[in-house]
Amino acid sequence: MDHTSPTYMLANLTHLHSEQLLQGLNLLRQHHELCDIILRVGDVKIHAHKVVLASVSPYFKAMFTGNLSEKENSEVEFQCIDETALQAIVEYAYTGTVFISQDTVESLLPAANLLQIKLVLKECCAFLESQLDPGNCIGISRFAETYGCRDLYLAATKYICQNFEAVCQTEEFFELTHADLDEIVSNDCLNVATEETVFYALESWIKYDVQERQKYLAQLLNSVRLPLLSVKFLTRLYEANHLIRDDRTCKHLLNEALKYHFMPEHRLSHQTVLMTRPRCAPKVLCAVGGKSGLFACLDSVEMYFPQNDSWIGLAPLNIPRYEFGICVLDQKVYVIGGIATNVRPGVTIRKHENSVECWNPDTNTWTSLERMNESRSTLGVVVLAGELYALGGYDGQSYLQSVEKYIPKIRKWQPVAPMTTTRSCFAAAVLDGMIYAIGGYGPAHMNSVERYDPSKDSWEMVASMADKRIHFGVGVMLGFIFVVGGHNGVSHLSSIERYDPHQNQWTVCRPMKEPRTGVGAAVIDNYLYVVGGHSGSSYLNTVQKYDPISDTWLDSAGMIYCRCNFGLTAL
C-alpha cells in the first residue's frame, strides 16, 4: 500500500441522499405506512407524518410540539383551507414541488400564508406578479394587501401606476372605493401623458354611480395636479361641468390653479410647488445658488419641468453660496460646502463653508445638517450605496485631496482614502459602483482622471481626457460618463467628451452651440441637460440638451436667473 495516499475519505452524497430521503418518505405517505396524522377537510382525508409537516411549516410544528390538543390527536380537521390547496401543500412537503396556476393560486396562497410556508408563498406571489394585466392588477393588489404580501402589493401598485391609462378603463377600476382611488391618483409615479388623463379617469369613476359618488368629487379633485392643466382646459372645465361649478370647494381648487397661470408670484407657495410636481419623478431639474455677477451671490432655487419646458421658483437657500457640491439622496437635495458671500458697505466677505443644507420636496423647505470635517469649495460630491461623498476642493488656503463621506444612519462624516492628487474645480461621477474624479485644478489645469473602488478603499488612475478642464459639467447615461464645457486655462470650452469604462478611453462628441464655464449638467431620460454658466462675455440662463443617440443638441427653456458656478441636479 502507498503510505502517501490518504487513509480516509469523506464522501459528499448530500444531493443524492436528500433525493432518496424525500422519495422514501413520499412512498411511505402514499402507502399510508408509519403515518401518524390525518388532515381532514370535509370528507377528504390526507395521511401524513407529523415530523415531515413540522419540518416545513412553523404552523404544524407549533401544533404538534406545543400544548395544543392536536399534539396528541391522530386526526386534525381544517375548516378554513381549501382541500385542493391543502393536498398541494402536503405534496410540496414530500416532493419540494408545487403546481401553481390561475385556477389554484387563489386558494393556495392563503393556505401557504396560514401554514407559514414561506417558499410556497413566495412562489405564489411571483406567479401572480407574472400574471399582472390592466384587468386584474387592482384585484391582485387587494388580494396581496389582505394577506400581507408586501412585495406583491408594491409590484401591483407599480403596475397600476405605470399602466394607468389602460387600467382606468377596466371594470375593476370602476369598482374601486373612493379611498383606494384617491391613493392611486395621488401617486407621484402615475404614468400619464398629461394631467387631463387623471381628471377624465376621476370623472368616469364618478359618473359610473353619480348619485352615490358625486360627494367625493372635491376630495378626489384635490389629488389632480390642476396647475399642470392648461388655462383653456380649466376654463372649459368650469363652464361645462356642473358638478364642479355647483361645488364651492371645487371652484376654489380651479381658481387656485388659474392663479398659477395668471399670477406668477403665486407659484412660490408651498402648495403650488407640490401640485405642480410632475408625475413619474425623478423627472425634474433643480438649479441652486451660484453667481449672476462678480459680486452677486445667489440664494435662489428653481426647478425645471421637461413636460411643459418651464421653470418655477422654490424656497431659497438658508445661506447664499456658489462653487458648492450638490447631489440627491432619498429624493432630497443636498448642498455641501462652497463659498458664502456676505456683502457689507465697502467690503465683501467670502467664507469657505463646511456647512450642509438639505431641501425636502414634500415641504419645500431647507434644513441644516451635520457639517463636514473640513471646509471645501469647488469640491466634488456624489452618492454611492446610500452614502454621500465629498471630495477634494479648496479650503481658502490649500488645495485638497482628502475625501470624507456622510453616513445618514449615524449622521456623521468619516474620512476615506484620499485621492492621489489635490483637485479643485473638478467634477465627480459614479459609474458601475466606482467614483470618478475628473480634471480640475491642483494647482495647474488637469485632464487626468482617477477612480475610487469602495471595496478596496483605494484610488487608481485611468485614461485622461482630451482637454484639460475646470468648472465643467458631468453626467452619466447609457453606461458612459459625459463631460461638457469648462475652461482649459486659455479659453472657454464648448467641447464634450464621453468616457467608456470598458475601453478605458475618451471620445470627442459634437460640441455645444456656445462655450460655457461654471456650467451645470444633469441627466433626464437619457438627455444631458447643460444649463447656465459663463460664455466668456456674459452670464447665461440658457439651456441646451444633448441627445447621445443622434449626437445632436436641442434648445430648452432658459432659467429664471442667469447662473454660474451653481448646483444642478436631477430628481
UniProtKB/Swiss-Prot annotation:
Pfam families: BACK, BTB, Kelch_KLHDC2_KLHL20_DRC7. PROSITE patterns: BTB (PS50097). GO terms for biological process: proteasome-mediated ubiquitin-dependent protein catabolic process. Residues 35-102 form the BTB domain. GO terms for cellular component: Cul3-RING ubiquitin ligase complex; cytoplasm. CDD domains: BACK_KLHL28_BTBD5, BTB_POZ_KLHL28_BTBD5. GO terms for molecular function: ubiquitin-like ligase-substrate adaptor activity. It comes from the Eukaryota. SUPFAM superfamilies: Galactose oxidase, central domain (SSF50965), POZ domain (SSF54695). Kelch repeats lie at residues 284-331, 332-386, 387-433, 435-479, 480-526, 528-570. Coiled coil: none annotated. Keywords: Kelch repeat, Repeat. This is Kelch-like protein 28. It comes from Homo sapiens. The gene is KLHL28.
